[in-house]
């Protein structure tokens, strides 16, 4: 009997210059209402998918990075400007992907704020 393969989730920026995937289930999917995240997406909230860094990889392209505050990096497509991910020193083994970049966002609905 073969082992079941982990589920693969894919995502991309608007122009498709950056594509990524992660294996398995995310650790969490949540909304953030802090000022920094709201400004980063010009919206009332930002929705993130938290995954272990070891589950994640870029398939195509590399994002640009902006350090929005000490220890906080925000990744975005240098071509179309789509916000792609967030990484912070508080979560050194995680990457927080923007929910809107998922190919099928309904696959992982938000579960909290």
Label every PLM stretch briefly.
Residues 1-113:
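A short Gly-Trp-Pro
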């Amino acid at each position: 009997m073969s082992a079941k393969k982990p589920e693969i989730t894919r995502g991309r920026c608007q122009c498709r210059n950056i594509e990524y995937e992660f294996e398995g289930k995310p650790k969490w999917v949540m909304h953030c209402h802090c000022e920094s995240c709201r400004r980063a997406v010009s919206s009332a909230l930002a929705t993130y998918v938290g995954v272990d860094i070891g589950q994640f990889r870029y398939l195509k392209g590399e994002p640009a990075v902006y350090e929005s505050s000490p220890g906080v990096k925000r990744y975005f497509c240098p071509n179309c400007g789509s916000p792609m991910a967030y990484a912070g020193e508080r979560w050194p083994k995680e990457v927080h992907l923007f929910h809107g970049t998922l190919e099928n966002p309904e696959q992982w609905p938000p579960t909290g704020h």
